[in-house]
């Protein structure tokens, strides 16, 4: 199911990929890759609040994975670019600092 969602994403079928990933998370709400992929897709479609929520969930599920916090920083940066809301600048910096402090 996840592989199919990735294929849809790669083919630019964002809506279909989102629908499939949401279904996957209904089955397995702890599937971190689905949360990270939804964060990317929601960012691409300008749904920054949803992107942030899914990236935060990935960080909660795998709090020792620095990649998740690096991705969180990027999600915040793109939220700032898409909305102009300055609060996202500090949040992006904080997430990146956290990722760097983990050293893995």
What are these regions (language model features)?
Residues 1-23, 27:
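Alpha-helical segment of the N-proximal tetratricopeptide repeat
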